[in-house]
Amino acid sequence: MSKRNIIWLLMAFFFIADLAAAVHKGKKEVVLSEQSLRDKVKGAWAGQTLGCSYGGPTEFKFLGTIIQDYIPIPWDKHTVKNWYDTFPGLYDDVYVDLTFVEVFERCGLDAPVDSFATAFGRTEYPLWHANQVARYNLLQGVKAPQSGYWKNNPHAHCIDFQIEADFAGIMSPGMPNQAAEICDRVGHIMSYGEGWYGGVYVAAMYSLAYVSNDIEYIVKEALKVIPEESDFHKCMSDVIRWHRKYPKDWKRTWFELQNKWSEEISCPEGIHNSFNIGTKINLSLIHISEPTRPLYI
């Protein structure tokens, strides 16, 4: 494990030592053993890294459509290393997270937004869309949270914070409201509105996954941190409803989703293209996944 991940693992242990959280269905107390905690933290980071690698061959290639079942997706024991060696930018989902994790390691759990923004602004790794504009804004003197505000960042509703909010949930086991608070400090550096809601929702699901293995419960419970009047909440609620209506046919749900929610103006590069980078439409794919095959959709 890399030095960064070791630091992060230790942080998680200190943060939730002797965890006892009443968050599950029956409001019963939930206690995590150190071994269970360690396994879940490692699994969270491994899952994120493997997910980036698995999506590498198809990213931005099947726009506005599904990947047909007969399309093979190559995978072997060398896949992760090959992608990292040839296109490390594929892992922006991971290295942006680690930038914020290092701020917590240096400044503590009460680190202010300026500390995160400064660290993010000093990075030199590849960035795109909301992240790229946010870093440019910071370097031009536009401070957070204005760096992510939609009037200053035309990509504010893009998927950026959604793919890098994992850390907030990983370090808030069983505490989705705490995950949302971390997102409030960090997420507005590059995102606003739906772009921010996507990150909060992902973080909340990570948080709840520490104390429940019930996917339906996690998906529904995490949605409570999102305002009901928002389009984001309405879209996710639709997907939950369609999945209940077509439990064995995720493709039918996908078509319903496209029919109602695929018109987006959230990304300047994608306004006239089937670009698939709007936050709502991407996160909804989590919901229509079959529990054992989420990466295939």
Question: Where do the language-model regions lie?
Answer:
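Single conserved hydrophobic/aromatic residue that forms the stacking wall/gate
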Residues: 286-297
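Active-site-surrounding "flap" and adjacent substrate/cofactor-binding loops of secreted or lumenal enzymes
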Residues: 57-88, 94-97, 114-120, 124
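Bacterial N-terminal signal peptides
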Residues: 8-18
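Mature N-terminal segment immediately following signal peptide/propeptide cleavage
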Residues: 32-55
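Bacterial N-terminal signal peptides that target proteins for export
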Residues: 1-7
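Small-residue-rich helix-loop
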Residues: 232-263
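Amphipathic alpha-helical interface segments
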Residues: 100, 119-229, 237-241, 263-264, ...
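Bacterial Sec-dependent signal peptides at the C-terminal "C-region" and cleavage site
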Residues: 16-28
